[in-house]
Every structure is written in structure tokens, then in C-alpha cells.
Amino acid sequence: MLGPILCDQLCGKGKFTAETAEANPDVLLIAVERCREAMVVAMEKAKAMGLKNVYYIDMDVEKIEEIFAGEEIDRLFINFPDPWPRKKNAKRRLTYRTFLDKYCRVIKLGGEIHYKTDNAPLFEFSVEEFAACGLEVKNLTRNLHENGIVGIMTGYEEKFHALGTPINRCEVVCKPFVLPKEEKKTAEDAE
């Protein structure tokens, strides 16, 4: 019998993916990465660890609905995505409402998105997007490792933690929602 299905979006070199799969042998972990060089490193790591419950997909995140059926995933991890800091690129952020809509279509009702970033402005933007979409945010922290290391860390996370950079984290409960209407663009948005 197939256990819970977890998806690690943009798994990078696979430290988090491999350690999560090793700690949870009863789950099926699907790792998505569009950079083939990073994915090869991740795959070699999983093979060296003898992991049988992790699979890798070379895919752009935008195509998630082409790979997964409706309400198939139990948990989706988004760890340290590109912040796309310019306002005009907000739609490229992996926590923008159109991405959230796609995620909530493939994540089971009541399933979760676990989200981590070192980028405070991106985190605030993301929390606002979650709220605008009517999604429940829980276990929100702006300094995850303040009192010691919590959970499995990504490679980026280890580096940022060593530098003393606070790690922002939250969990988002997925449910059906209607995409909020797009706001009218202003000259300031083009920055």
C-alpha cells in the first residue's frame, strides 16, 4: 500500500530530500528540480544512501498539474525559492496566487504546504498571498532556529543559519479557493 505522497519543489542538490526520505521510509517523496546538474547530485546522494522511496522529476514548477492528479499530494515543500525581488516579477514567485491555485489543486484537501525562506520581504509577500487566497497559515515563525535547530535543514538553510540569518517558516493548509482578482498595475509596480 502506498503511503503519503510528499513533493519537494526545487529540491536542489537534494540534502533535504534525501534526509526527509530516510527519516520517513513509509512515504513516497517526489523531488522536482529543473536544473539537471543539481538533480544529478541529488539522485546520486539518494542512491548512495540506498533510498527506495524517492523519485526525481526534471520539470518546471508551472507544470505541476501535468504530473500530479487532483488531490494526490499530502504535503508540498517549498524551500528557499528565488525571491524575484522586483515588483514586476511578483508573478514568478512560487508563492504567488496562481501557483497557490495549482498547488491546492494537486494537494489533498487539508494537505499542507511547508514553506521556508531566509528572505524576509518574500516571506511577508507570501503570508499576504496566503491570506488573500483564504488559506490557513499555522506554525508561523520568523526565526525558526532561534532556540536550536528544528527539523531537517536544507543546504542553503545550513549556510544561512551559520551566518546567523533568521529562517522564516510556516505551514499552509490547502483548501479550494477562488483566485483573488488581479490588482490594477501602477507605475510603482514596474520597479
Language-model regions: role of each:
Residues 1-7, 15-22, 44-70:
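S-adenosyl-L-methionine
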Residues 10:
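Conserved S-adenosyl-L-methionine
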Residues 35:
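Conserved SAM/SAH-binding beta-strand->alpha-helix loop
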Residues 39-40, 123:
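Short alpha-helix immediately C-terminal to the canonical SAM-binding loop
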Residues 95-109:
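A short glycine-rich, Lys/Arg-flanked "PGG" loop and its adjoining helix->strand segment in the class I
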Residues 110-117:
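Conserved beta-strand signature within the Rossmann-like core of class I S-adenosyl-L-methionine
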Residues 126-128, 133-191:
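Class I S-adenosyl-L-methionine
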